[in-house]
Amino acid sequence: MKQRGPAGGRSSSPKPSAPGSGAGEGPDGRSAPASQKINKASANDRSLDSVIAADKIAALKLAPVSRETEARLDRYIALLREWQAKTNLVAPSTLPHLWTRHIADSLQLVDLAPTARRWADLGSGGGFPGVVLACTMAETPGASVHLVERIAKKAAFLREAIRITTSPGVVHLAEIGDNVDRITGPVDCVTARALAPLHQLIGFAEPLMRQGAKALFPKGQDVEAELTEAAKYWNIQPQLHQSRTGDGWIVELNAAERRG
């Protein structure tokens, strides 16, 4: 049987908390000084710094780069972490693994198109792989990377990333499907990462592929299902390359013809 409190079943008033028992309070019951909160945030930042530093070592073993490219990537990552606080550029859970999850995953595309100097990255978002590709080609004569992004804040970040890394990138603020035809000059390779299902990506990239571009699309473990779906709309002969950085795959296409 439930016990009833005094005054017609109302529960008694809660006892006052003991001094210092409130969240953020010191032993005298006062709020913890701001300096303590700042020190805690600084400690968290230092911890994340050391995790990212170790992740960088692992990533550069998977995908080695020159010292000049490494320096550019360092500036890019520093900028991304700064902007991440106000603009969601990457999933927060992936921050400790920026180098292996995002940088190395992007760098492996270069080896699949070693002669490509002119790239198009559709739906660049936080710059993967577009900014990474641009960093690797900063000293390549005639190199350029077109980064197409529809969200203004992300496009602003991409422009700043290209500026501080002194990389050969051109940012287009536009809807993906509306802008591909406007890219001037030939494109050797078109890519898109975490943007849309494969059959839609082919639709975005087909105008460039028709002009001779190769397509490289990083995909996850469900690549076979995406290929099956894409084959309903497109005649394609895909090549699959296993990712170095996880269980995913990279779909390579040299041509695509829409089914009647």
From Swiss-Prot:
GO cellular component: cytosol
Keyword match rRNA processing: yes
Residue positions binding S-adenosyl-L-methionine: G123, F128, R193
Enzymatic reactions: guanosine(527) in 16S rRNA + S-adenosyl-L-methionine = N(7)-methylguanosine(527) in 16S rRNA + S-adenosyl-L-homocysteine
EC number: 2.1.1.170
Residue ranges, compositional bias (Polar residues): 33-45
Biased composition (Low complexity): 9-20
Oxidoreductase listed as a keyword: no
Alphabetical UniProt keywords: Cytoplasm, Methyltransferase, rRNA processing, S-adenosyl-L-methionine, Transferase
UniProt-annotated location(s): Cytoplasm
Annotated region (Disordered), positions in chain: 1-45
Disulfide feature: none
Listed Gene3D superfamilies: Vaccinia Virus protein VP39 (3.40.50.150)
Domain of life: Bacteria
GO molecular function: rRNA (guanine-N7-)-methyltransferase activity
Protein family according to the UniProt entry: Belongs to the methyltransferase superfamily. RNA methyltransferase RsmG family.
PANTHER family: S-ADENOSYL-L-METHIONINE-DEPENDENT METHYLTRANSFERASES SUPERFAMILY PROTEIN
Function: Specifically methylates the N7 position of guanine in position 527 of 16S rRNA.
Protein name, per record: Ribosomal RNA small subunit methyltransferase G
Gene that encodes it: rsmG
